[in-house]
């Protein structure tokens, strides 16, 4: 799933239309737009399917279904997700301890579910001028 930034979209299922990350409805993000540096910017993250095979991603209508998620709700451990409600609008996987993200420089990194929440959110934006260290 694409990373839309650090704020959620319309709870009425219209998707994320004004994200500050790489992917959101009608976005046209280019490499030159990633001012925080491609090495420090999350682009695509893992998204597991819940054990009950409920909604793998948020149910929505129209043409703006979420194929991208914000980091506002934090990371969710797949092992602790008892039903589909616990998986909505979160990045997570069934891996022990964390999940994979593709960064703007094309690298793939494994991030712990215990990573600092502020760092996680800072890495989801493309031009927040945050200094990220991990």
Whereabouts are the PLM-identified features?
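Surface-exposed loop/linker segments characteristic of extracytoplasmic
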Residues: 1-134
């Amino acid at each position: 799933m694409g990373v839309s930034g650090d704020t959620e979209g319309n709870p009425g299922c219209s998707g994320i239309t004004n994200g500050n990350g790489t992917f959101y409805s009608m976005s046209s993000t280019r490499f030159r737009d990633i001012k925080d540096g491609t090495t420090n910017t999350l682009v695509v993250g893992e998204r597991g399917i819940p054990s009950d095979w409920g909604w793998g991603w948020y149910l929505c209508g129209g043409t703006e279904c979420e194929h991208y998620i914000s980091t506002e709700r934090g990371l969710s451990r797949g092992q602790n997700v008892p039903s589909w409600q616990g998986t909505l609008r979160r990045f997570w996987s069934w891996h022990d301890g964390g999940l994979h993200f593709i960064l703007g420089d094309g690298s793939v990194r494994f991030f712990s579910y215990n990573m600092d929440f502020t760092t996680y959110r800072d890495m989801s934006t493309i031009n927040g001028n945050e200094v990220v260290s991990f």
